[in-house]
Amino acid sequence: MNRLQVELPGLSLKNPIIPASGCFGFGREYAQFYDLNVLGSIMIKATTEQPRYGNPTPRVAETPGGMLNAIGLQNPGLEKVMGSELPWLEQFDLPIIANVAGSQVEDYVAVAKKISKAPNVHALELNISCPNVKTGGIAFGTNPEIAADLTKRVKEVSEVPVYVKLSPNVTNIVEIAKAIENAGADGLTMINTLLGMRLDLKTAKPILANRTGGLSGPAIKPVAIRMVHEVSQVVDIPIIGMGGIESAEDVIEFFYAGASAVAVGTANFVDPLVCPTIIEELPSLLDELGFGHISECQGRSWKQVCQSR
């Protein structure tokens, strides 16, 4: 029995560890360090219909416990992704999750309709929560009605299950999650980065050319855990949790909160071997905690409370 096997809509994962979109490119660089077949899946970099060159530099700033980024969805565009990147990934026995982005609803629909036809794309991740672009992105993820409408429109054209990436930069994430579920989403991924800023001590000006950027890394893990904990209790669709994961212990904590799988982001920049290391360490941690299968951890924090009432 594979103790780490996870079954999600459109995704049969040998383990629940997935490199997060934007922190793994299309896998080429990391394939130099290890066999990507050990992963559960890969969330490829956000894809837009036309190539995007991203925001001006500087686009990255270190922070205590993480980093700020304002990349701005730089990517080679749908044609290049489907003509080069996805075919390259076919050599691996991995279900690919394609991250879809755009400036308006029609952009998402156009990309989703085409990229969902790729033979190795098993699910879509709608990026409605990027805080680093002036149009689209987070604008779709902070309003329940708009988020639901976009989800519904994409579901109508997609040939694979649709997961929606939630923004933490909202007052009530539960309301948005429910609206997206009711619109037909097959799953949720959460959370995206928190909007932040750093100032230069000598100039008093923002370090990032974009002024603000998305905060990621261990600093946001408590926020991510809290939000997964809240949302998982009110939706009936699976959650892929993310935000500051860098160890097997972090993975279990997200499962306790209610996640069914996890995505590892910023930690890949610090240690390119972090994903295979976590996968290797998970079975012994399950032994230590007395679990036979990773699924036994799912929602344990709140399910125990419900059972004791």
UniProtKB/Swiss-Prot annotation:
It is found in: Cytoplasm. It catalyses: (S)-dihydroorotate + NAD(+) = orotate + NADH + H(+). Binds 1 FMN per subunit. InterPro entries: Aldolase_TIM, DHO_dehydrogenase, DHOD_1B, Dihydroorotate_DH_1, Dihydroorotate_DH_1_2, Dihydroorotate_DH_cat, Dihydroorotate_DH_CS, Dihydroorotate_DH_I. One of its GO terms (molecular function) is dihydroorotate dehydrogenase (NAD+) activity. Its cofactor is FMN. FMN binds at residues 21, 45-46, 99, 127, 165, 191, 217, 243-244, 265-266. Keywords: Cytoplasm, Flavoprotein, FMN, NAD, Oxidoreductase, Pyrimidine biosynthesis. Pathway: Pyrimidine metabolism; UMP biosynthesis via de novo pathway; orotate from (S)-dihydroorotate (NAD(+) route): step 1/1. Its EC number is 1.3.1.14. The active site is at residue 130. One of its GO terms (biological process) is 'de novo' pyrimidine nucleobase biosynthetic process. Heterotetramer of 2 PyrK and 2 PyrD type B subunits. This is Dihydroorotate dehydrogenase B (NAD(+)), catalytic subunit. It comes from Bacillus cytotoxicus (strain DSM 22905 / CIP 110041 / 391-98 / NVH 391-98). The gene is pyrD.
